[in-house]
Amino acid sequence: LKNIAERYDGYGNSIRKVMEQKSDHKGLIGVVSDLIQVDKKYEIAIETALGGNIQNIVTEDEKTAKEMIAFLKKNRFGRATFLPLTSVDGTGNFKNKDALEEPGVLGLANQLVKTEPKYEGITAYLLGRVIVTEQIDDAIRLAGKYRYTLHIVTLEGEYLSPGGSM
């Protein structure tokens, strides 16, 4: 138990409490950060793109997520976001394929991480609409060309949101 607490040091209390239940609940898989590998070059961009979602908890199914929500409520441990494999799927969401051919674009964030095939729907859901660019000038040019409709992150972690905020 101590090892789990140390492993999730820096995570919210609710996340640690749920992960302490992992040995008793086969349907608890882990937090998003446990399920992806990222090359050093892309680490800052991916961390920025994920934001708080890096602590989301992946479960096998909705039943496990529901049980863990009840556990958190019963014990007043707080809230957590659960991503059941049986219901979360982000494949096919990105519509502006032409944007991926623009100068300075490295690809969609979900294509720049490694994960097991069974978790690809999760990474597509969380990262499949975020374009990664080399530099902020590339991101600004891209955002303007596509009328500020894209989610864009740079290698240094600058984030441009639809609507134009940076």
Question: Which residues does each PLM region occupy?
Answer:
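Hinge-like oligomerization/junction regions that interrupt long coiled-coil arms in large cytoskeletal
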Residues: 3-166
